[in-house]
Design a protein with these regions (language model features):
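Short nucleic-acid-contacting surface segments enriched for D/E, G, S/T with interspersed K/R
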Residues: 59, 94-102
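Compact, glycine-rich, soluble single-domain proteins
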Residues: 63-66
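Non-catalytic linker/capping segments at the edges of enzyme domains
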Residues: 1-53, 73, 78, 91-95, ...
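Short, structured beta-strand/loop micro-motifs enriched in basic residues and often containing a Trp
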Residues: 82-87, 117
Length: 167
């Protein structure tokens, strides 16, 4: 529908190649997805010189992307925004010769607020590379909101500036 604004980012910021599982039971759910690691991924060229590693924040962004998709899959209409997380632990890394990143996200709460046109999802995530757990993220939060998209880029307009979102 025309009001459907939720979408994945375009490559190279898209951190997901496929969704293997998605489910919901009440306010809880689960989403499992993967991304194939490529030797020539853009971030290996610049992070870091002579020591290529995927930035950990891109793994966190992948979790936010998937939680946003979960909201859309549940019927949320609007534009998705990452709203934060309570904890992030990195205890491994992603290198150019690794094969697959796997996201396992347990949605601990999904709330649709139809009066305001908002949906919120909160999830706990485990990120694995080639089967080894390397990141844990607690309470990653994404909201889907109506009437915040900036669809006339690059022109200045009512929504062309950032700053704090209205409460």
């Amino acid at each position: 529908p025309p009001e459907f604004k939720a979408r994945f980012p375009l490559p190279p910021m898209l951190m997901v190649d496929r969704i293997d599982h998605i489910s919901r039971e009440g306010v809880r759910g689960r989403i499992v997805a993967e991304r194939d690691i490529r030797l020539d991924d853009w971030f290996f060229q610049c992070h870091f010189l002579e020591d290529p590693v995927q930035p950990g924040c891109l793994g966190v962004d992948g979790v936010w992307q998937l939680i946003g998709f979960y909201c859309a899959w549940n019927g949320a209409l609007g534009t998705g925004r990452a709203l934060g997380c309570s904890e992030v632990d990195f205890f491994g890394q992603i290198r150019p010769h690794d094969k697959v990143v796997r996201y396992e996200i347990d949605i601990v709460r999904y709330q649709d607020l139809p009066q305001s046109g908002t949906a919120i999802a909160i999830g706990d995530a485990d990120i694995l590379v080639d089967g080894d757990s390397i990141y844990k993220i607690k309470r990653a939060k994404v909201g889907v909101f109506r009437d915040i998209d900036y669809n006339d880029y690059p022109w200045p307009s009512q929504r062309s500036r950032g700053g704090k979102m209205a409460e």
